[in-house]
Amino acid sequence: APLHTMLNAGVTVGLGTDSVASNNRCDLIDEARFCGLIHRAESRDFKWPDADRLLSLATLDAARALKLDASIGSLEIGKLADLVVIDLSRTHGTPVHDPAASIVFSAEAADVLLTVAGGQVLFEGGELKTLDEQALRDAVNRALTRMS
């Protein structure tokens, strides 16, 4: 859908992912990047949407779309402590002139160092902290085998 048209009409737009069944990847950085590139090419305005707008679509605007902006979507007193720490020092992301642009247009999932949701560390040092990733993969594969 044309992002500019929806935003001008007052539609609350948020970016997100649903499952690999429909999109092959659950990577919100990719979603923001593709949203920006697609709409820049479509509008021929190669500066719109800018990286700040794309990050907002993936964070606070997404929370607004879900009517959860009172508790998530931005770092504010009283909201849940949800955050992601991204390493922008790797060669594919340097030099960093604009951190938002570096996140949206250069970062990738492998650059994520830490993920915290509701104040709980979920991912750190390349490992899921609250799930047994191998057990989860095994369960998914067993379910897939039963459905085949």
Where are the language model's segments positioned?
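Short, exposed beta-strand "edge-strand" segments with a Pro/Gly-rich flavor and a Y/T-containing core
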Residues: 1, 24, 43-49, 94, ...
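His/Asp/Glu-enriched, well-ordered alpha-helical/loop segment
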Residues: 3-90, 106-107
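Active-site microenvironment of metallo-dependent hydrolases
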Residues: 56-148
